[in-house]
């Protein structure tokens, strides 16, 4: 975990249904510090005595700063109902928000975002409500690139990764040999992150004999699981992906509640 800061500079060359009511402390805003500056986070705390397994959620590139997101909030709430301390890190806290059409800025900011995530994981290490040995990443698009990068750099801190339509930056492929278990979820008609990146990750993890699963959704585009993006949303694929995600988390975080 401590090694994230040391190698994040390498990333400068690296080319994102739920219950109606919840039995936990709901979407709570907080912050931690990274490099002496604040980073906004939101968390949902499950009922019962901890320490709990935890899931760190990372948004995609389209997230706006300080805007919240009801769909991420729903996911956070459902995961808390399943017994996970769930934290949503707003990693744009120290940079401007960027979009898919800004690759140069994205490349420059990537190490900053990764350092923020590093600091967030450090804060979870010290949180008495969290079991630091059972922490997973749940990433979407750009958030998946960050999740996989964190897993490649320091797999000992991360027990599992669920990645929706992302990939592993080529500069970090060396980390595949010790990557934690990964669930790959991708649409074969993705116009933003080509499905070839999912297949490349699958081949790399297979070569390194790392545990992983992959599901490619036929006809699905990018962000197929977000109702707010109606043009790409597919309810059946979204539900299937969420079911696979929660089963994968339960299996790899040894969550006895589900």
Regions found by a protein language model. Give the residues of each.
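Cap/lid segment of the alpha/beta-hydrolase catalytic domain
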Residues: 62-71, 78, 88-112, 226-228
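Short glycine-enriched nucleophile-adjacent loop
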Residues: 144-155
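C-terminal catalytic histidine-bearing segment of alpha/beta-hydrolase fold enzymes
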Residues: 208-258
């Amino acid at each position: 975990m401590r090694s994230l800061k040391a190698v994040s500079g390498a990333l400068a060359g690296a080319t994102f249904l739920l219950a109606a009511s919840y039995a936990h402390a709901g979407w709570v805003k907080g912050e931690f510090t990274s490099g002496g500056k604040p980073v906004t986070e939101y968390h949902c705390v499950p009922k019962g005595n901890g320490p709990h397994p935890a899931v760190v959620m990372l948004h995609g590139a389209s997230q706006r700063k300080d805007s919240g997101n009801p769909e991420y909030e729903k996911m956070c709430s459902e995961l808390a109902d399943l017994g996970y301390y769930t934290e949503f890190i707003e990693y744009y806290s120290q940079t401007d928000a960027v979009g898919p059409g800004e690759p140069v800025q994205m490349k420059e900011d990537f190490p900053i975002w990764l350092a923020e995530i590093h600091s967030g994981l450090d804060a979870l290490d010290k949180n008495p409500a969290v079991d630091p040995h059972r922490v997973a990443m749940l990433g979407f698009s750009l958030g998946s690139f960050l999740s996989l990068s964190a897993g490649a750099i320091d797999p000992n801190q991360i027990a599992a990764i669920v990645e929706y339509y992302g990939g592993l930056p080529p500069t970090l492929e060396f980390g595949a040999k010790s990557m934690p278990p990964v669930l790959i979820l991708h649409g074969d008609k993705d116009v933003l992150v080509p499905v070839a990146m999912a297949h490349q990750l699958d081949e790399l993890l297979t070569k390194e004999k790392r545990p992983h699963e992959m599901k490619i959704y036929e006809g699905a585009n990018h962000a197929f699981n977000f109702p707010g993006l109606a043009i790409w949303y597919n309810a059946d694929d979204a539900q299937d992906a969420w079911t696979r995600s929660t089963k994968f988390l339960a299996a790899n975080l040894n969550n006895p509640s589900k």
